[in-house]
Amino acid sequence: MKQLDYLRTVPRSGTGAPSVYLTFDDGPNPVFTPEVLDVLAEHRVPATFFVIGAYAKDRPQLIRRMVAQGHEVANHTMTHPDLSACGRRDVERQVLEANRAIRMACPEASVRHIRAPYGIWSDDVLTTSANAGLAAVHWSVDPRDWSRPGIDAIVDAVLASVRPGSIILLHDGCPPDELANTDASFRDQTVAALSRLIPALHDRGFIIRSLPQNH
């Protein structure tokens, strides 16, 4: 498997300002996804939400809100397993059921991208994604916000690593198998960091854009 089989960064094109891309994994969460959406709306910037299908099924109103606010809803599988430990049929089921759940929640959603749970890719995952018309997207900036390192640490980690074309990984929820851990689902640090990151990125000359449809 080659790294080029999935997108780590978006190549810069044209002569405009350098672009960066905000992405959120593991939602929608009933508490923190609305807060993330509020911050994005305040600053008028787009994002891509890689949602877990089971959550999309249970919280369709949040999927509809994402789409209504101009964000992209993307596939993060149905239940967030390690796909490298799954057989081909299980991989197909995880991907296709998540697509169906998103579209049932919001028929207007155009699902174009997928991110493998834990960023673990395999040939089966890439083949299944391509067959479903989904472009595979990884990331290039990971502040490990899920570990709750502190607001300053999240902001500093992003600003230290961001480059033109960077795909920034953040989290608005947590996987189903981590819900028993009380702290795992808290994304208050991510929300607070986001409200500082967006102006800081703009101050550095970056434009926050939606992921390209074709790449």
Swiss-Prot record:
- Keyword set, alphabetical order: Cytoplasm, Hydrolase, Metal-binding, Nodulation, Plasmid
- Write down the SUPFAM superfamilies for this protein, in alphabetical order: Glycoside hydrolase/deacetylase (SSF88713)
InterPro entries, per the entry: Glyco_hydro/deAcase_b/a-brl, NODB_dom, Nodulat_NodB, Polysacc_deacetylase_ArnD
Name the site position(s) for Raises pKa of active site His.
145
The UniProt entry's GO CC annotations, sorted and at most eight, read: cytoplasm; membrane
Q: Where does this protein reside within or beyond the cell?
A: Cytoplasm
* Ranges for domain NodB homology: 18-209
Q: Which GO terms describe its biological process?
A: carbohydrate metabolic process
Instruction: List the EC numbers from the record.
Output: 3.5.1.-
List the active-site residues. 25, 171
Q: What is its main location?
A: cytoplasm
Q: Which GO terms describe its molecular function?
A: hydrolase activity, acting on carbon-nitrogen (but not peptide) bonds; metal ion binding
Function noted in UniProt = Is involved in generating a small heat-stable compound (Nod), an acylated oligomer of N-acetylglucosamine, that stimulates mitosis in various plant protoplasts.
Please report which protein family the annotation says this sequence is part of.
Answer: Belongs to the polysaccharide deacetylase family.
Protein name as annotated: Chitooligosaccharide deacetylase
